[in-house]
Design a protein with these regions (language model features):
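Conserved beta-strand elements of the Class I
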Residues: 5, 121-123
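Gly/Ala-rich phosphate-binding loop of Rossmann-like dinucleotide-binding domains
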Residues: 133, 137
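N-terminal Rossmann-fold NAD(P) dinucleotide-binding loop
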Residues: 129-130
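Intrinsically disordered, low-complexity terminal segments enriched in Ser/Thr
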Residues: 116-118
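Phosphate/diphosphate ligand-binding glycine-rich loop within oxidoreductases
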Residues: 2-113
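Glycine-rich Rossmann-fold phosphate-binding loop(s) that bind the pyrophosphate
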Residues: 9, 124-126
Length: 137
């Protein structure tokens, strides 16, 4: 079994578990499951890691995109530059952090922006806002 999941708090707004459960089923991935790990404090991520031996990946949502970084063994360059992580890959117990928000926001912005757009107003200061700021550079 390969376990994937989402960490954050609260997770009542999230559609991730339903989406990925349906996606795994439609792709014939019976050995894959997706769980929500609603943790009130970031320190509880250690419990998630220790109690989920089949865990291979996590999505990270509010309020932990910034707070999760000290729990990573490796962070990619974008995580280092933005100070935000939204995706963790676990290989042989090593937790590697990535920021895929930058790619998503960047792709969306590239469709709309032209060379005449020289300024932007980014509302917010959290992990997603940091990804947007990075994508706008």
């Amino acid at each position: 079994m390969k376990t994937f999941g989402l960490i954050g708090f609260p997770l009542t707004h999230s559609f991730s578990k339903k989406y990925f459960t349906e996606k795994f089923a439609s792709e014939g991935l019976q050995d894959h499951c997706y769980e929500n790990f609603s943790i009130e404090h970031i320190e509880l991520i250690e419990k998630v890691f220790s109690e989920q031996p089949t865990l291979v990946g996590l999505n990270v949502t509010i309020p932990y995109k910034e707070k999760v970084i000290p729990y990573l063994d490796v962070a990619d360059e974008i995580v280092k530059q933005t100070g935000a992580c939204n995706c963790i890959k676990i290989v042989q117990g090593k937790k590697m952090g990535f920021n895929t928000d930058v790619i998503g926001f960047g792709t969306s912005l590239d469709i709309k922006l032209t060379h005449t757009h020289t300024h932007a107003l980014v509302l917010g200061t959290g992990g997603a806002a940091k990804a947007v700021q990075y994508a706008l550079k």
